[in-house]
């Protein structure tokens, strides 16, 4: 019987020092929210990878330390447009949502699409209609916007006015500003889980990139770029500069390296993240769970928040090879 695994990320990008504590707190809370659904205390092994992934992503969608749900980045019109995808590896079912507004949990809308509808991908008005018809609350316009997101949009606009390309000048954003929540390259949240039955599920959710045009669609809802799950190979959730991830098809390339080159989850993630940045210039990262339960965590961005639980210990990090660990409990 496979050992349950839950690996999550809170986005890759130019994350300032002042935001690290919030990222770590959010990662730990998301793991606490989800782990009990994946590995029940009764030891029955009957936990659900699908429930755990949704719960972990929902937790981060509620947390303004992440670019998903509440606190998502803003487009050029100052609005939040959300995207999410969810995929399960047994039957390759998936639900993909884009251009969703004024709904807190796009990952749940993606699950409802996957489980109850005949389509795989909905956007705009159709996604909005599905969300409201299946129980999502319609929030007041602007309810998902935070002061941090407004400040980051202003910083983006200032860089554009100075003739800079803010989508690639990631280290230009300063560390001494108190809030800016996300750099223009775009952070994302994601989770990959495998339960005791061997079922692999991946979920990814984002607000996109600061300063995007209204109607822009990124990598997160695109299968093979932002999300992919296949019980025969593994599961991948990616994060970073969306246009780069789409062009490179990062998630699928990582799984292909595992399948056809015999690489481990870690080696495949390292190889493809490096090759993507070398060829295209944009940065990003990925978390990977192989079909045997091995883990991969890799990024070419300055930082990427991540965490997982193993043998009663939580492991987490945000930069380089630095790994923090502490005893894991479900209570705060």
From Swiss-Prot:
Reactions catalysed: L-asparagine + H2O = L-aspartate + NH4(+); Cleavage of a beta-linked Asp residue from the N-terminus of a polypeptide
EC number, as in UniProt: 3.4.19.5, 3.5.1.1
Gene3D superfamilies: (Glycosyl)asparaginase
Active-site residues per Swiss-Prot or TrEMBL entry: 188 (nucleophile)
Coiled coil: none
Keyword presence, Isomerase: no
Chain positions recorded as substrate binding sites: 216-219, 239-242
Keyword Protease on entry: yes
An example molecular function term from Gene Ontology annotations: beta-aspartyl-peptidase activity
GO cellular component, one term: cytoplasm
Protein task: Has both L-asparaginase and beta-aspartyl peptidase activity. Does not have aspartylglucosaminidase activity and is inactive toward GlcNAc-L-Asn. Likewise, has no activity toward glutamine.
Protein name, per record: Probable isoaspartyl peptidase/L-asparaginase CG7860
An example Gene Ontology biological process: asparagine catabolic process via L-aspartate
